[in-house]
C-alpha cells in the first residue's frame, strides 16, 4: 500500500484549538481530527493545508511553523501526517465535510475521541 502525504491544520484562536468530527460514512468516521487532507502532485504541504481548509471549512488560513509528523497505517490507509500551526485570516467556518466541530483547550482534548495519528500529536501541543 502506497504511503500518502497528508497535511493537517492545528488552527488556534484565543488559546483554543479547532477540532472537527469526521463524517460517519468515511474511514475513521465519528472520530475527531485536526482538519486537512491529501497532498496533490506538485503541491507543497503548506499549499495542501491551505487548499484543504478552504475546501472543507470555507476559510483562508495563514500557515505557520510545522508542529510535527506522525505515521498511521491500517487495512485501508497508509498515511504520513504533517501538522502545521495555522490561523484563520478571513472567512467564517462552514462545515462542508465534517459532522461537528469545537474549539477546545488542551485540558479538554481528553473529552474527545481522536483519530489515530491525531491523538498522538496532542502531546506536542
Cite the ranges covered by each PLM segment.
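Conserved N-terminal beta-strand and adjoining loop/helix that marks the start
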Residues: 1-17, 38
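Conserved hydrophobic "DFG−1" position in protein kinase catalytic cores
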Residues: 11-12, 19, 86-88, 103
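Conserved Nudix-box catalytic region and its N-terminal flanking loop in Nudix hydrolases
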Residues: 16-55
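Short secondary-structure junctions
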Residues: 56-63
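Active-site-adjacent beta-strand/loop module that shapes the phosphate/pyrophosphate-binding cleft
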Residues: 60, 69-92, 100-102
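NUDIX/MutT-family hydrolases
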Residues: 85, 94-124
Amino acid at each position: 500500500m502506497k504511503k500518502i502525504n497528508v497535511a493537517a491544520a492545528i488552527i488556534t484562536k484565543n488559546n483554543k484549538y479547532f477540532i472537527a468530527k469526521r463524517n460517519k460514512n468515511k474511514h475513521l468516521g465519528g472520530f475527531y481530527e485536526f482538519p486537512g487532507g491529501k497532498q496533490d502532485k506538485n503541491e507543497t504541504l503548506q499549499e495542501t493545508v491551505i487548499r484543504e481548509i478552504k475546501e472543507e471549512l470555507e476559510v483562508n488560513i495563514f500557515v505557520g511553523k510545522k508542529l510535527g509528523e506522525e505515521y498511521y497505517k491500517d487495512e485501508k490507509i497508509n498515511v504520513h501526517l504533517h501538522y502545521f500551526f495555522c490561523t484563520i485570516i478571513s472567512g467564517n467556518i462552514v462545515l462542508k465535510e465534517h459532522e461537528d466541530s469545537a474549539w477546545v483547550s488542551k485540558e479538554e482534548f481528553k473529552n474527545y475521541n481522536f483519530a489515530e495519528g491525531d491523538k498522538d500529536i496532542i502531546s506536542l501541543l
